[in-house]
Curated annotation (Swiss-Prot):
The gene is ugpB. It comes from Rhizobium meliloti (strain 1021). Belongs to the bacterial solute-binding protein 1 family. The complex is composed of two ATP-binding proteins (UgpC), two transmembrane proteins (UgpA and UgpE) and a solute-binding protein (UgpB). InterPro entries: Bact_solute-bd_prot1, SBP. This is sn-glycerol-3-phosphate-binding periplasmic protein UgpB. Keywords: Periplasm, Plasmid, Signal, Transport. CDD domains: PBP2_UgpB.
Length: 430
């Protein structure tokens, strides 16, 4: 009887432990070094307590993850947390009843939410007009310029002074190509996010009407204005000569840089982890601009964490605990310093500065200085469309036709505006 009693007690003990750990699925789109960071952070959180277990689940690219989340919600089987890229923010904000604001989640969990503790530009981007933070900004980034120092030296370019304006970048790309310093002068990830949305903000020109969508959903695109045409025609001309090489619609072009094929890359600061691991002798510069227009301020990219409605109070408490964990200064500082993403709290930023990290790692403060250097204007607060992922797809189709020589920049941008405006109008009416 005693043996039965002991075994029964053990069995009940294990059952209790299994029930006590409330599982919280976190769907995400991170790969490479950034996926390693997610695994490390969730392991650290899970080991810090025994009540909740966060389970990270990779769901593909940013658009694929968003689509998977939408489908899961419709089938009433959503995860507790989903990582949604910046372009999907408008879609999530418009889905009333499908999400619970992050600020509300933190308050439900017994935590005091003080938005003054967070970087203002990041919090504002993921908040309602009344200031309510809707999602937790996990991996916010800013586009910057990376350059291959060895290729610059071979081409006779200044290794310690990367080009600052777009005309200077284009000239450097030509010189790199013609000198044979690298097979390709330059490339860029995310032509939509970097070369249109951030291009607008950084050069203080409108992307669309109605404050780029922040003032209302009825938006008319303005990305066929003369400065855009000049910029994209210059890129198209470089592509004809092979000085610019197209890598793909999202972050694929990063491989062209890490392989040594292209010597200049405009990419998210969040791409730093993979670039650092590649062994390329790289330098960092600010995002290029046009004289007389920029630099103004960049807008956040990357992604934030959204919480689906329909979960239990216990699950929401667990999510609040996890968000609070991610907000800790040491966690934010580590995420920033290892990945290149920006810290979301002022305390983590100040801690990183005090540690001397930026002095030891030149260029690493650049994303933050770009975003916070100037107060935003109507052109540089951000872009918020109810169907921004769809509009990006339209732009990418026209850019790809341009880069393959099927049309010039003006035709590509005119068609993108016409098609994009029609898609926005249809999305609003639906």
């Amino acid at each position: 009887m005693r043996l039965i009693s002991i075994s029964t007690t053990i069995a009940f003990g294990f059952a209790f432990q299994a029930q006590a750990a409330t599982e919280l699925q976190w769907w995400h789109a991170m790969t490479g070094a950034n996926n390693e960071m997610i695994e490390e952070l969730t392991k650290e959180f899970n080991e810090s307590q025994s009540t909740y277990k966060v389970v990270p689940v990779f769901k593909g690219t940013y658009p694929e993850t968003l689509n998977a989340g939408i489908a899961a919600f419709r089938s009433k089987q959503p995860p507790a947390i989903i990582q949604v890229f910046d372009a999907g923010s408008g879609t999530m904000m418009a889905a009333e009843g499908a999400i619970v604001p992050a600020a509300e989640i933190l308050q439900k969990g017994g935590f005091t939410f003080d938005k003054s503790q967070y970087l203002p530009g990041i919090v504002a981007y993921y908040s309602k007009p009344d200031g309510t933070m809707l999602s937790f900004p996990y991996n916010s980034s800013s586009p910057i310029l990376y350059y291959n120092k060895d290729a610059f030296q071979k081409a006779g370019l200044n290794v310690d002074n990367p080009p600052k304006t777009w005309p200077e970048v284009f000239e450097a790309a030509k010189k790199i190509k013609t000198s044979g310093a690298a097979p390709c002068g330059m490339t860029s990830t995310w032509l939509t996010w970097i070369q249109t949305e951030n291009f607008a903000a950084w050069n203080n020109v409108p992307y669309g009407t109605n404050e780029n969508g922040l003032g209302g959903t009825d938006v008319k695109l303005q990305i066929n204005a003369p400065l855009y045409v000049e910029h994209f025609q210059a890129i198209a001309d470089l592509a004809k000569d092979g000085a610019f090489r197209y890598g793909g619609r999202t972050s694929e072009a990063k491989q062209l840089f890490t392989s040594g094929e292209c010597a200049i890359l405009t990419e998210s600061s969040g791409g730093l982890g993979d670039i650092a691991k590649s062994g390329v002798n790289y330098g960092i510069g600010q995002l290029p601009y046009y004289e007389g227009h920029g630099p103004q301020n960049t807008i956040p990219g990357g992604a934030s964490l959204w919480v689906f409605a329909g979960k239990s109070d216990e699950e929401y408490k667990g999510v609040a605990e996890f968000f609070n964990f991610l907000s800790q200064t040491e966690i934010q500082a580590k995420l920033h310093q290892v990945s290149g993403y920006m810290p979301v709290t002022m305390a983590a930023y100040e801690e990183t500065k005090k540690s001397g990290f930026y002095e030891k790692n030149p260029g690493r403060e650049t994303p933050l200085l770009q975003m916070m250097g100037k107060a935003p204007t109507e052109n540089s607060k951000g872009v918020r469309l109810v169907n921004l992922p769809q509009v990006r797809d339209i732009l990418n189709e026209e850019f790809e036709a341009m880069l393959s020589g099927q049309q010039d920049a003006k035709t590509a941008l005119d068609k993108a505006v016409e098609r994009g405006n029609a898609a926005i109008a249809a999305a609003i009416s639906n």
